[in-house]
Structures are given as C-alpha cells and as structure tokens.
A protein has these predicted regions:
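Acidic (E/D-rich), amphipathic helical modules within compact regulatory domains
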Residues: 48-61, 73, 79-82
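HEAT-repeat alpha-solenoid elements in large eukaryotic scaffold proteins
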Residues: 14-18, 45, 84-88
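Eukaryotic acidic, Ser/Thr-rich intrinsically disordered low-complexity regions
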Residues: 150-186
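Amphipathic alpha-helical scaffolding segments comprising HEAT/armadillo-like alpha-solenoid repeats
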Residues: 2-14, 33-45, 64-76, 96-115, ...
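Alpha-solenoid HEAT/ARM repeat scaffold
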Residues: 10, 22-23, 38, 53, ...
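Alpha-helix N-cap/helix-start positions at coil->helix boundaries
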Residues: 18-22, 34, 49-50, 65, ...
Length: 186
C-alpha cells in the first residue's frame, strides 16, 4: 500500500519527514482520522522538524480535546515552520469546525507573545490570525493588533494586523458573527 514497507500509523508519521513520501503519508494519515491521532500526537516529539510540522498540520483537521494542549505547546517549538503550522491549526476553524476551538484562556498568551517577539515574520503573521479571533472580546488582543499594525518591522505583518485590528475588514465581519468564525478572508 502506498509503496511503503510499513503502513502502520507510527511508520507513516515518520515518513512525514521524507520529502519523497510526505504527501502520501499525510493523505493516508488524514484518511485514518481518529485512528491516527495517537501516532500523530507522538510525532509532535520527533527530532525531525518536518515530522513535527506535518503532525501540526494533521492536527489542524484531527485535533481533539486531549491533544489541544500539545498543539498549544508546539507554538513554542524552536523551528519556525512548526510554529507556523501550530498557529494555523489553533487559529483555523474551517478545518475542524467549532468542536475543538480553543478559548483565549489557552491560546491568547502564547499568541500575544509571538506576535510581539517572534523573530520570524511568518510566525508573527500566523499569530495575527489567532490574536484576531479575540480582538472583538479582549482589549489586549485589539491593542496588540494595533501595535503590530503600526510598528511591526514586516510590511506583510503590518498589513495583516490591519485586517484583524478594530476598523479592519476581518474585524468588522467578526463583529457581525460569532467569535469562532473561520479566519480565512472571504
């Protein structure tokens, strides 16, 4: 199956670190759904950052209440690609619905920290999306977005922060909808 010697979920998780096999392994793990979650969670501790990144991407679709804490912890990973995937998974409601949408008590502090201080502009841009989920209900989130919009060294982060900050188009849409709306611009 899939040209792999072993096809158990643990072996497929390790294949996420192999550029030749990552796509097929990802698709197969995703198709296994809940049956793969345990192996995916274990993969968050793999030495290979590509495996950790792939596991965060999978948890974007497969996260459950038991794995949410581990996904939040991945926002502090030393590899920027892993942090980006973790922030996307935490911010994106489109892929998982509202069943596991994390509340501000679990995710806002790490998102605020990375928005203000992460050295990678792509990580800060993804942190904008997570902070933006709470800009209508938390003054700290709104203030952090305004600060980022005005002062972030990256023009792309400043622009994105403006979309999510009070007065921005995504913020305006969120004011008209529940706080757990999808983060993707329409």
């Amino acid at each position: 199956m899939l040209g792999f010697v072993r096809t158990d979920s643990e072996a497929l998780v390790s294949c996420l670190g192999d550029p030749q096999r990552t796509t097929a392994a990802y698709r197969e793990l995703l198709s296994r759904g809940d049956r793969a979650v345990s192996a995916v969670r274990a993969g968050l501790r793999d030495a290979n950052p590509a495996v950790r990144e792939g596991c965060c991407r999978l948890l974007d679709h497969l996260v459950d209440t038991d794995s949410m804490g581990e996904l939040v912890a991945m926002a502090g990973d030393p590899d920027a690609r892993v942090r980006i995937a973790a922030f996307h998974a935490l911010a994106c409601d489109r892929c998982k619905g509202d069943t596991c949408a994390p509340g501000p008590d679990r995710v806002l502090e790490p998102a605020l920290h990375h928005l203000a201080a992460d050295p990678d502009p792509h990580v800060r841009a993804m942190a904008v999306e997570l902070v933006g989920k709470f800009a209508c209900s938390d003054a700290r989130a709104a203030a952090a977005l305004r600060e980022s919009q005005a002062n972030d060294p990256s023009p792309a982060v400043r622009k994105k922060a403006g979309w999510y900050a009070p007065g921005g188009p995504i913020h305006a849409r969120r004011q008209r909808r529940p706080a757990t709306s999808a983060h993707h611009p329409e």
